[in-house]
């Protein structure tokens, strides 16, 4: 069976970490943003050795605090040409929000489940982004 990846970076990461299990199902709970909106989430991989779900990113996270904030911004951007560029999706997508990732991490932690964001090469993170992730307590690594 051929494994389908969401991005080339996920495929490359998996080739370098073949012991990881590709995750196609939703994480084992639901999550709630600051507006009370319930959402589901997926991780990219599961590490059976460390019992950790792993989300791979190759861009720094955006700062949209709620799913609706993200959708509102995407709606405005979409009005210009009828679609979002890949960069606009990363800069405004809820899936790429530092707050979404933090909600997922904190909720899973309450269930005794570890969740790690891996910023995989050639990710460039600003000092401001690193400071913010550290201040919020986001569990991440840069590889």
Give the location of each predicted region.
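Nucleic-acid endo/exonuclease domains
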Residues: 1-143
